[in-house]
Curated annotation (Swiss-Prot):
Known function: NAD(+) hydrolase (NADase) that catalyzes cleavage of NAD(+) into ADP-D-ribose (ADPR) and nicotinamide.
SUPFAM superfamilies assigned: Toll/Interleukin receptor TIR domain, WD40 repeat-like
Name of the protein in its database record: NAD(+) hydrolase ApTIR
Annotated WD repeat ranges: 420-459, 465-504, 510-549, 555-594, 600-639, 645-684, 690-720
Entry annotation: catalytic residues: E84
TM region(s), chain numbering: 192-211
């Protein structure tokens, strides 16, 4: 048997909708003499009892012209539906696959040229990659109520017409017109049949009346004959004229009798016709009753299917409820296990914390004893005192041991002094490894020192290539590159690979006044300079012999007296006599971007320093204070603390690479060392009082263990 369409669907999702679609396709535009407009296969109506279910379905698929897919999440997950699609596509064109979405989502990915299976919950996996372009699908997600699943419902009838149009080989509008014509023909035929029946009934009644009239005429004729015979017998004696008249009258009567007989025969023929029409009417009525019986049977099947669908939904809901209960119980057990595991971890963590606390207290006690012994041995055996202080700091590297070690160092003769400049020493710099110290003076000289023996630093070289006073110096992290800034507005780049024989690589020009500040990034690729001309400049020194100026910063309104770069070179800080410091983004070094302006000092900002990670900024000012700033959000710096230990201008600040130690130098002839473990509450560790003049410069080695300070004439180097 050939089918016009095969319906593939999920019983759980569309047990009621699938029969309604089948009935609609079979009835829409049906001719009066045919039981169905289309032959539609659906598993519950098209299959007989068989031992080979899939084989029967395959036969139906092969004999079907169109494949109607009722797409839903349940159908997408059904192995039967996917198997039916795969078999259909192996033997038919995808053009004859008609998708009808009954629930879920059907989403087309225009970029991929395929159905979006991630967002399409109603699309079976078997349809991946089969469509050459976006298919037109019918949306029946609204059709759920019983009254919506009937051709008398306008929207449902319209949807069925759209689905059936292609199967009939005509447009939807033509199919609508055809259905209207068929409906009107059926009404006309019903009315005609009723009229014929009524006419037949009237004809039968008329024939019966005619037959009765004919019988009356025959009777009357017989009476007339009898009377005629009597008259003839009685009046035989009448004249020939009367006899002729009688014969003539007899002929007339015989003619009337013949007409009556013909009328009777015609009445009998009409009665036979009426009886035949009555039989046809009875057969038509029987066919009508049979059709009503078929309709009633279809309705009963539909009701049974709906009841079965409701039962299946009930079973599915019950299974879902059981699954939900099982999932809830599994989740409860998981939470119990997780809680027990958390308690076990907490107990283990508490035990570990108590053990660590015991070890910590033991280290603190040992460290305190060692610091006490160091204090006792400070005068009689300085070397032993320092060793004890170092041991105490190693055992417990806390603020107390750090302060004790610093105090021991500054109170012994192991703080070294270097001399040699004939004018004010304006700057000092230490390499990251603490092996190279550079000092500069207003006498125009720059000296290179080896501070390995901090008690007796050794001078390695003296740079005298400039006759102008040198105001500032900076060393790269590896100690191989030195930059100096001079009164004549120039900066110079030096190669210290051989520290005993420094070699000048380049001279930088561009400033129009004293270069008072220089700084190198951690990777040695970026140089920043600041000048009394009110500008700062950014240079590329990747090629040290041929530096390139990248940008000039002109936002300050007074001399730029301090610059500092973060370890990664992405952050620049500048300080100025305009009482402000500024933070710059150097991600694009050729186009620096100002992120923030820091205010708070009441006099010129003469010193800035950045920690290695760029999160901490220190500023020093002529107002006698130093300030700490949090640059975690560089666009919104936050002031952490104000350091007020000095009694005069703060000329210089230096931060260790880890940002935990700060050194400051002041006009009050002292340098101070601060513990920044808690940046919001800095703690002064030591005050260094060995200088007899203003401390113009301080420098910390990368590991924070060596501090160099410079006063107007002397330089000191001490261990930390």
């Amino acid at each position: 048997m050939r089918y016009d369409a095969f319906i593939s669907y999920s019983h759980a999702a569309d047990g009621a909708l699938a029969p309604a679609v089948q009935r609609g396709l079979q009835r829409l535009a049906r001719r009066w003499h045919r039981p169905r407009a289309l032959e539609v296969f659906r598993d519950q109506t098209g299959l007989a009892v068989s031992h080979a279910l899939w084989s029967s379905i395959k036969v139906a698929l092969d004999q079907s012209e169109f494949f109607v897919l009722l797409a839903s999440p349940e159908a997408a997950a059904s192995p039967w539906v996917n198997q039916e699609i795969e078999h259909w596509l192996s033997r038919h064109s995808v053009d004859r696959l008609l998708p009808v979405v009954t629930s879920g989502e059907w989403v087309w990915d225009a970029d991929a040229g395929d159905v979006d299976l991630e967002r399409s919950t109603a699309v079976p996996p078997a349809l991946r990659g089969v469509f050459g372009e976006e298919p037109r699908h019918l949306d029946l997600r609204w059709a759920r109520a019983e009254h919506e699943l009937d051709l008398r419902h306008g929207r449902f009838r319209d949807a069925i017409a759209e689905l059936a149009a292609g199967m009939h080989g005509m447009s939807k509008e033509d199919l609508d017109g055809e259905d209207v014509i068929r409906h009107r023909q059926m009404l006309r035929m019903r009315r005609g049949a009723l009229a014929v029946v009524c006419a037949l009934l009237l004809l039968v009644a008329g024939t019966a009346v005619a037959w009765r009239n004919a019988r009356g005429e025959v009777t009357a004729t017989n009476v007339a004959l009898q009377r005629q015979r009597a008259a003839t017998a009685a009046e035989q004696h009448r004249t020939e004229e009367a006899a002729d008249q009688a014969r003539s009258q007899q002929q007339i009567v015989e003619a009337e009798q013949q007409r009556a007989q013909k009328a009777a025969e015609e009445a009998r023929g009409q009665q036979a016709v009426a009886e035949a029409e009555q039989q046809r009417a009875l057969r038509a009525a029987g066919e009508a009753r049979r059709q009503e019986g078929i309709a009633a049977a279809e309705q009963r099947r539909a009701q049974k299917a709906a009841a079965e669908a409701r039962r299946q939904r009930g079973v599915a809901d019950a299974e879902k409820a059981k699954a939900n209960r099982a999932a809830a119980e599994a989740e409860r057990q998981r939470k119990i296990a997780a809680d027990e595991q958390r308690k076990a971890h907490e107990a283990a963590a508490e035990a570990e914390r108590q053990r660590e606390e015991a070890v910590k207290q033991q280290r603190i006690a040992i460290g305190r004893r060692l610091l006490g012994q160091a204090g006792e041995a400070r005068d009689r055996d300085p070397r032993t005192a320092i060793q004890l202080g170092i041991a105490a700091r190693h055992i417990y590297p806390g603020p107390q041991s750090q302060a004790g070690l610093v105090e021991t160092l500054v109170r012994t003769h192991y703080a070294g002094t270097v001399t040699g400049h004939t004018a004010v020493v304006s700057a000092v710099a230490l390499s990251g490894d603490g092996r190279t110290l550079v000092t500069d003076g207003l006498d125009g000289t720059v000296m290179v020192w080896d501070p390995t023996d901090r008690a007796a630093p050794r001078r390695l070289a003296q740079l005298t290539s400039s006759t102008a006073p040198v105001y500032t110096v900076a060393l790269s992290g590896d100690g191989r590159t030195l930059v100096t800034g001079s009164e004549d507005g120039t900066a110079m780049v030096w190669d210290l690979t051989d520290r005993a024989a420094p070699r000048r690589l380049a001279q930088l020009t561009g400033h129009t006044d004293v270069v008072d500040a220089v700084a190198l990034s951690g990777d040695g690729r970026t140089l920043a300079t600041g000048s009394f001309d009110g500008t700062a400049m950014v240079w590329d020194v990747t090629d040290r012999a041929a530096p390139r100026r990248l940008a000039q910063l002109t936002d300050h309104t007074a001399p730029v007296t301090a610059v500092a770069l973060s370890g990664d070179g992405r952050t620049l800080a500048t300080g100025s006599d305009d009482h402000t410091a500024m933070v710059w983004d150097l991600t694009d070094r050729a186009a620096p971007r100002r992120l923030a302006q820091l205010t708070g000092h009441t006099a010129g900002v003469d010193a800035v320093a950045l920690s290695g990670d760029g999160r901490t900024l220190a500023t020093g000012s002529y107002d006698g204070t130093a300030m700490l700033w949090d640059l975690t959000d560089r666009a919104a710096p936050r002031r952490l603390a104000q350091l007020t230990g000095h009694t005069a201008q703060v000329y210089t600040v230096a931060l260790s690479r880890d940002g935990r130690t700060l050194a400051t130098g002041s006009e009050d002839h002292t340098a101070m060392v601060w513990d920044l473990t808690d940046r919001a509450a800095p703690r002064r560790l030591a005050q260094l009082t060995g200088h007899t003049d203003a401390v113009d410069a301080v420098a910390l080695s990368g590991d924070g263990r060596t501090l160099a300070t410079a006063a107007s004439i002397t330089r000191r180097c001490c261990g930390m």
